[in-house]
A protein has these predicted regions:
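N-terminal glycine-/serine-/threonine-rich phosphate-binding loop
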Residues: 26-64
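Ligand-binding beta-strand-loop-alpha-helix segment within the catalytic cores
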Residues: 28, 86-151
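Glycine-rich N-terminal segment of FAD-binding domains in flavoprotein oxidoreductases
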Residues: 57-80
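Glycine-rich beta-strand-to-loop/alpha-helix junction loops that act as flexible
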Residues: 66-71, 152-156, 207
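A glycine- and small-aliphatic-rich helix-loop capping segment at beta-alpha/alpha-beta transitions
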Residues: 78-86, 109-112, 165-173
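Class I SAM-dependent methyltransferase SAM-binding "motif I" and its flanking Rossmann-like core
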Residues: 149-194
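C-terminal functional extensions of proteins
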Residues: 198-244
């Protein structure tokens, strides 16, 4: 695994998104219901591997953004049994807590462990820079024009990425990466709605009874929850029976 460093002094090489890109209630979600969290992890891994092979065959690389939470790490464990072109894979973070390196709260800590020796390029969010606003702008400069795949989770409160109810970051339309207010004790760096709209495909992994209500709202296109405002070219929801 190659973890790429980042200087906070970079400038975005891509145009700022327009507000029109940021919000959307017409998103159609395909739902796949599976037996349990293990089945969700296995199906998610197979889907990621298939998308990776297709992207590399078509364009020579696979640009994949990964959220935190519990579901992605089980999926990554299942990826060990899949054929993935890791040497042509670039992994980005959807969100990250502002915490010291190797802190167990860091999504990067879990991502690094999950990848093991897989030779993917990892572009971590620079949450240890002294100027986090400049660091967020620098990370935005690294983002591709399109993500081949973005993984998202769904919180019981309807949040996704670190786009949480009531946070001012929900209204950001002119930046691809932004900082949140403290949530569960941590400030977060997160991709914004315009950044998520760059996804050619979104994969939602949703498990547990406490996700029933937010999942129903997501599938209904309910924009009163943050997850319901995500817009992308295509969306697949893999949920276990407890959530669905």
């Amino acid at each position: 695994m190659w973890v790429e460093g980042l200087s906070a002094g970079g400038q975005s090489l891509v145009p700022n998104p327009s507000p029109k890109q940021a919000l959307g209630s017409e998103m159609h979600h395909e739902l796949q219901t599976l037996a349990d969290p293990g089945a969700v992890a296995r199906a998610g891994a197979a889907f990621v591997a298939d998308r990776a092979r297709a992207a590399v065959a078509a364009n020579g690389s696979f640009h994949f953004a990964v959220s935190g939470g519990h579901t992605p790490w089980a999926m990554f464990a299942e990826l060990a049994s899949e054929t993935v072109p890791w040497d042509a894979t670039v992994i980005y973070q959807v969100d990250e807590r502002v915490a010291p390196p190797d802190d167990p709260d860091r999504n990067l800590t879990h991502l690094t462990k999950a990848l093991g020796s897989a030779p993917a390029q990892v572009r971590p969010m620079p949450v240890n820079e002294s100027d986090l606003v400049a660091a967020a702008a620098s990370y935005a400069a690294l983002l591709p024009e399109h993500f081949d795949l973005v993984h998202l989770g769904l919180g019981p409160d309807g949040h996704t990425a670190s786009l949480v109810p009531g946070d001012p970051v929900l209204s950001v339309t002119d930046r691809l990466v932004a900082l949140t207010q403290p949530y569960q004790g941590r400030v977060r760096m997160t991709l914004t709605y315009p950044a998520l709209a760059r996804a050619r495909q979104i994969l939602w992994l949703v498990t547990g009874e406490d996700k029933q209500e937010p999942l129903a709202k997501l599938l209904a296109g309910d924009t009163t929850i943050p997850a319901g405002r995500v817009e992308a070219a295509a969306s697949l929801v893999m949920a276990d029976r407890a959530a669905a």
